[in-house]
Amino acid sequence: MISLPEKFLEDVKVILQDEYEEFIDSYNENKTTGLRLNTMKMSKEKFQKLNLFDLEQIPWTNEGFYYDESVCKPGKNPLHEAGVYYLQEPSAMSVVPKLDIQKGDRVLDMCAAPGGKSTYILSQLDDTGLLVSNEINPIRINALGENLERFGARNCIITNTDSTRLRKAFTGYFDKIVIDAPCSGEGMFRKDPVAIQDWTYSKVLECQSIQKEIIRDGYKMLKKGGILVYSTCTFSREENEDVIEEFIAENEGAVLIEKERLWPHKIKGEGHFVAKIQKLDDEDCRVKEMKLKKLNN
C-alpha cells in the first residue's frame, strides 16, 4: 500500500471510526477513471451505439461513464479532441447536478481550471444563459480556455482575477455559483504521488483560510433565491464541514440544503465533498428569523 501522512491518517480515523480500515484498504485498489459526454455535440443514445469503449454508467450523472484505462484510451480518440466528451474523475461529476441548472441561468464557476465543472455547466445550459469561468492562476487558465473551446463554448466568458475583484463586478448577479475550492487534495492521493509529498497540515489550514474568503465573496455574487454549491476533493473536516458551518452561522439568509461526502471505500471514485446552499429572499429570511425567535423563547 502507498505510504500516507501520519497526521492525515489520524484525522481520517477520527472522522470514519469503524470504517477506517475499509477506507485504508481502498488504497490497494486502482484509481477510477471516467468520461463525461458533451450532449451539445452528440446524444447519449448515438454515443452508446458507437460502442467505442467498454463503459459503465456512473450512477450520479446521466452523462458520465466509467472506463478502464488499462483496456482503452479515450483520451487518444479523435472524439476527445473534437470535444464530444471530457475526461473527468467520476466523483467530481457529482458536483454540477447539485446546481439544478435551468436554461437561461447565469452561472459562475469561481475556480474553473482545468474546466471539468465549466464544461459540464455548458452542456446543461445548452447554448442558453451565460457562464463566467474564473481562474486566478494565469498558467492554469490556458488549459481552461482550450477545454472550453474544444467543448464548443459560445455563451461563456473567461476571467482571470481574484474573488474580491470578481465580487465587486458581479454583486447579486448569478442564479447559480459553483466553488470547486482550492484544497489540500487528499482525494488525489490514490492517483497522484506528488499530492502525498506536497501534503502538510499547514497546507490544510492555509487552504481553509482561502476557502473561507472565496465562499464569502461568492455568496455576495448570488441572487436572492440562488444556489451556491461548494466542493473539494479533500477529506479534512477543516476544509469541508468547518468552512460550511462557520459560513452558515455568519449569514442568516443562507440555508444549507444538503451536504454529501463521497468516500473511495463507499463509491467507485476518488472522493469528494459537496455542500449545497440557497440564498433566501427577504420574505424567507423573515420567516427563518421568526422560527428562530420561537425556538429561543
List each model region and its residues:
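S-adenosylmethionine
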Residues: M1-N297
